[in-house]
Amino acid sequence: MKNNLAIKFIAILVMSYLSCGSANASCDDAPIDGVDYSNCQFSEGQDLSRTYIPNSNLSFVSFIKVIFDKSIMMNSILINGNFAESSFFRANLYEANLEGGNFEKSNVTSANLTRANFKGASLIEATFKDSNLFESDFTGANILNANFEGANLNNAIWIDGKKCNLGSIGKCIK
C-alpha cells in the first residue's frame, strides 16, 4: 500500500514538472524564446534592440514607440497588438503573425518579413523601405501613405486579396 502511494506521488511530481516546461511569463519577466506576454501593457519608448523572442505570443500587447531594432521575433504572434511609432529596423519577423495590429508610423526598414501576416493591420504611414515582404499577406490592411520603396513584394497578397507578380519591388504589380 505504501509503495503504491509513493509511486502515485512520484508520478504526480513528474507530471507537475513536465507541465511547467512552457515559457509563460508575467509582464515583468525578461524576454526569452517562446515567452507569452499576451495582454501585457509596457512602458512607452523602451529600447528592446536585439531582443531574442522567437516563437513568442505578443498578442493584444501595447508596445508604443518601442525600439525592436535587430531583434529576432520570427514565428511570433503579434495579433491585435499596438506597436504604433515603434522601430523594427533590420528585425527578423519571418512568418510572424501581425494580423489586426497597429503599426501606424512604425519604422520597419530593412526588416525580414517573409511570409508575415498583416491581414487587417493598420500600416498607416509605416515605412517598409528595403524590407523583404516576400509572400506576406496584406489582405484588408490599411496602407494609407505607407512607404514600400525598394521593398520586395514578390508573391505577396495585396490589400485586395490579389497576388503581386514577380518583379514587385517597391510596389505591387498584378
Feature roles, as predicted:
Residues 10-20:
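Bacterial N-terminal signal peptides
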Residues 23-174:
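Tandem repeat scaffolds
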Residues 1, 15, 73-74:
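Detector for methionine-enriched segments
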